């Protein structure tokens, strides 16, 4: 998938990596030096877009400084991206046995008997007081605690309209409203209204995701300081966070929909066990 990063950072005209990128009036992107090679307008006071023939005068041309900075970063990270994004075939050998940690579950979350599935209910659950428990945000952590190595797990999101999954620092403050962002110690992807997918960068990165997404693979590589997300319906890459810190242990993070009817089977999040990955139904006999 790394070729997609390279493709998006190429000049539309010379097809090489963008250098000092500029926008024409119509949105066409090319290198600053490629402007001299574009066809001139009949009047001679502008250039023609090679795609749509819209004329751009000198004052219409905008220097894309932010895009240029992004392209530079992509070029610098390309070796690491190539390494990470070609590991999908071998990720499953790092799959870990994991359950949900009930002692961290916010009291409006129902956890199944097998500790693999979770959904939200308006009815508050009677649980013991725990310093580890989330409040007020509807979140729960996985039982695993990661300090080194490579780890992989799969989460069934089904047709849920709202969810967030990924990893967080173990040291996050669980006793206040959660704001998902890297700077707050969260590396997650999620969806709102079943159509707006995003990664918890700051600001959020909107993602283009297959609408048939039902199961997500998560690969944490503490050697490469990255965590990547994969659409298991077609094996496509969703997003990778790079240069994650390694100063704190990480925990798997789950937050199901909290704004849909109680017991709605579509809103369940489930961890796939190592021996039998698959879709799980609604939790029964909740804890």
UniProtKB/Swiss-Prot annotation:
Keywords: Cytoplasm, Metal-binding, Nucleus, Zinc, Zinc-finger. This is Ret finger protein-like 4A. The keyword Isomerase does not apply. Residues 78-278 form the B30.2/SPRY domain. Interacts with PSMB1, UBE2A and CCNB1. It comes from Mus musculus (Mouse). Gene3D superfamilies: 2.60.120.920, Zinc/RING finger domain, C3HC4 (zinc finger). The keyword Zinc-finger applies. GO terms for cellular component: cytoplasm; female germ cell nucleus. A zinc finger (RING-type) spans 11-53. It is found in: Cytoplasm; Nucleus. Expressed in the ovaries and oocytes (at protein level). Expression restricted to gonads. In testis, present at later stages of spermatogeneis and abundant in elongating spermatids. One of its GO terms (molecular function) is zinc ion binding. Coiled coil: none annotated. CDD domains: SPRY_PRY_RFPL (cd15821).
């Amino acid at each position: 998938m790394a070729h997609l990063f390279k493709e998006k950072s190429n000049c539309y005209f010379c097809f090489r990596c963008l250098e000092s990128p500029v926008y024409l009036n119509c949105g066409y992107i090319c290198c600053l030096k490629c402007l001299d090679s574009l066809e001139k307008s009949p009047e001679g006071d502008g250039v023609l877009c090679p795609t749509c023939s819209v004329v751009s005068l000198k004052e219409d041309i905008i220097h894309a400084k932010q895009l240029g900075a992004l392209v530079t970063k992509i070029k610098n990270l390309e070796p690491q991206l190539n390494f990470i994004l070609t590991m999908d075939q071998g990720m499953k050998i790092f799959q870990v046995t994991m359950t949900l940690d009930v002692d961290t579950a916010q009291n409006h979350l129902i956890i199944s008997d097998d500790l693999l599935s979770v959904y939200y209910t308006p009815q508050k659950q009677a649980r013991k007081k725990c310093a580890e428990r989330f409040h007020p945000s509807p979140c729960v952590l996985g039982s695993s605690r990661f300090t080194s190595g490579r780890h992989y797990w799969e989460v069934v999101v089904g047709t849920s309209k709202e969810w967030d999954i990924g990893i967080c620092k173990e040291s996050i403050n669980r006793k206040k409203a959660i704001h998902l962002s890297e700077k707050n110690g969260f590396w997650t992807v999620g969806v709102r209204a079943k159509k707006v997918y995003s990664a918890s960068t700051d600001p959020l990165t909107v993602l283009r995701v297959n609408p048939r997404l039902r199961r997500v693979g998560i690969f944490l590589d503490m050697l490469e300081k990255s965590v990547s997300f994969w659409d298991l319906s077609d094996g496509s890459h969703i997003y990778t966070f790079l240069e994650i810190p390694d100063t704190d242990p990480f925990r798997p993070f789950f937050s199901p929909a909290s704004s849909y009817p109680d017991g709605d089977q579509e809103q369940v999040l489930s961890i796939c066990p190592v021996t039998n990955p698959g879709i799980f139904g609604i939790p029964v006999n909740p804890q």
